[in-house]
Regions:
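N-terminal glycine/serine-rich phosphate-binding loop of ATP-dependent small-molecule kinases
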Residues: 1-90, 116, 144, 216-217, ...
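Active-site core segments that coordinate phosphate-bearing ligands/cofactors
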Residues: 3-4, 13-16, 105-126, 132-164, ...
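A generic structural motif
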Residues: 28-31, 95, 292
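Short, conserved phosphate/pyrophosphate- and ester-handling motifs at nucleotide-, phospho-/glycolipid
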Residues: 43, 97, 233
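Short beta-strand-loop/turn "lid" adjacent to the catalytic site in phosphate-handling enzymes
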Residues: 56-95, 120-125, 156-177, 200-203, ...
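Extracytoplasmic/secreted proteins and extracellular or luminal domains
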Residues: 60-63, 194, 381
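Gly/Ser-rich phosphate-binding catalytic loop and adjacent alpha/beta segment
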Residues: 100
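A structural motif corresponding to the C-terminal end of an alpha-helix
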Residues: 190-197
Length: 478
């Protein structure tokens, strides 16, 4: 039995699995703090406390003593800043934080070729510009800085006491030279970072430590249990689906959204803000369009109207038509393919007759339109894919998957365990590190439970064109 721990933005999720079957899951919700407009933070100890609580839930259903190894997964890009005692000096600055706009401009000027080294152009959500921001705006805290980790790696530190990361999570910092899978001294220097602040980089299935006696006492896990490096949530989601070989892709619908295509070569496309990153497995890379808002607008509008996410989708299913409002879902700016941290959301086309169902439909459609824009940014790469799998909480919506299939013109497959993707992928990496699975086994794809074929695109194409025109108009005003 193998344990996968995924440090998400909205929850810590645990999956206990055999090599090819999920046995049990647990989840503990997380809160996000926004002390200033555009800021997004979580304290790393909140992740640890939630992990311990989730393990407590899991222990009521399975024997933790039977776990053979642990794999880690987590939200990418978060800046976990530690002092010499390996304790946090401030809350972590998350992937959807937009404070470091000026620092991104400075980094582009200092490193004009950064997109072809780091695989993407600088944007505020990435880790590197946040350190330059810290030096400029919080010099006392910058002076305490001795180690920089990513969210899942802090949980690794609490479990086994070692500083470590993997290539796929390191890829999202901007400090990684993607083709070499090693830290770039020049980019580190340009962002006021010492190389010895950054952890060693491993492959995702490498064992990097074992559970300490102290961690065992806090979690109920056996001391000495091996822990593998794991991966960023995009890469572990890929491992859960067998998207480790060229020509396989998927969409992820969580708080953020991703369109992911595996590759055997490093293929940068920075001009369209398509991320070209190292995979968590050796000699593999991927291209990914990353959307900051994903399925989050559904929960956002639900919060405004007093509905659950499921109720929003159910209402959206009751209406359709060209006179519905258009919604821009850019609640925290947008990354792929716009590279626009300043754009914000809005409704256009509200009328006296507009209903709550109309508004809900507009919000759900907007997510599909974002994926259509993302697919377009890939060019010919996306055309070669026969289908795309779907994971994440938003993948449970038949309406949303059908809309995405139609807007991008590809069948969408919902596999078994779709809502547990990254945590399950982390468990599979643990099984690989322990010897129960081979690299070849990790390419196995789970059975599909549902399939969504593209529908008639005519009506949606007209609304998609209005969606794109609305972005251009709002950007001009902004």
């Amino acid at each position: 039995m193998y344990l996968g721990i995924d440090i998400g933005t909205s929850a810590v999720k645990l999956v206990c699995a055999e090599a090819d079957q999920i046995l049990s899951t647990a989840s503990v919700a997380l809160d996000v703090s926004s002390p200033e407009p555009g800021w997004s933070e979580q304290h790393p100890d909140q992740w640890w406390q939630a992990t311990c609580r989730a393990l407590g839930q899991l222990s009521g259903r399975i024997a933790l003593s039977e776990i053979k190894a642990i794999g880690l997964s987590g939200q990418m890009h978060g800046a976990v800043l530690l002092d010499r005692n390996k304790r946090p000096i401030r809350p972590a600055i998350l992937w959807n934080d937009s404070r470091a706009v000026q620092e991104c401009d400075d980094l582009r000027a200092a490193q004009p070729q950064i997109g072809h080294i780091s695989g993407v152009l600088p944007l505020p959500g990435f880790t590197a510009p946040k350190i330059a921001w810290l030096r400029r705006h919080e010099p006392d805290r910058y002076g305490q800085l001795a180690h920089i980790l990513l969210p899942k790696d802090y949980i690794g530190l609490r479990l086994h006491g070692a500083l470590a990361t993997d290539a796929s999570d390191a890829a999202g910092t901007l400090w990684l030279d993607q083709s070499k899978r090693a830290w770039s001294p020049d980019i580190a220097k340009a962002t006021d970072v010492e190389l010895d602040w950054l952890p060693p980089v491993f492959d995702g299935h490498d064992i990097v430590g074992t559970v300490t006696a102290e961690a065992a006492a806090e979690t109920g896990l056996p001391a000495g249990l091996p822990v593998v490096a794991g991966g960023g949530d995009a890469a572990t989601g890929a491992v859960s689906l067998g998207a480790t070989e060229s020509g396989r892709g998927f969409i992820s619908l969580g708080t953020s959204g991703q369109l992911f295509v595996a590759d055997k070569v490093f293929r940068p496309n920075p001009e369209r803000y398509v991320h070209a990153f190292a995979h968590t497995l050796p000699d593999r890379w991927y291209q990914m369009a990353a959307m900051l808002n994903g399925a989050r607008p559904i929960s956002w509008i639900g919060g405004q109207l007093g509905f659950s996410a499921a109720e929003v989708v159910a209402l959206a299913e009751t209406v359709s038509g060209d006179r519905l409002p258009i919604f821009l879902p850019y609640l925290t700016g947008e990354r792929s393919p716009l590279g626009d941290p300043h754009i914000r959301g809005c409704f256009y086309g509200l009328e006296d007759s507009t209903t709550r169902a109309d508004i809900c439909r507009a919000v759900v459609e907007s997510i599909a339109f974002c994926f259509a824009d993302a697919a377009q940014s890939f060019g010919d790469t996306i055309d070669s894919l026969p289908e795309l799998s779907a994971i994440g909480g938003g993948s449970q919506s038949d309406l949303l998957l059908g809309l995405i299939a139609t807007t991008i013109g590809k069948p969408i497959v919902r596999p078994e365990g779709a809502d547990s993707g990254p945590a399950y992928g982390a468990a599979r990496l643990a099984a690989c590190g322990h010897g129960a699975l081979s690299m070849t086994d990790l390419a196995d794809q789970p059975p599909e439970t549902d399939r969504f074929e593209p529908g008639d695109p005519t009506a949606l194409t007209a609304r998609l064109n209005r969606f794109r025109a609305l972005y251009s108009a709002v950007k001009a005003v902004d």
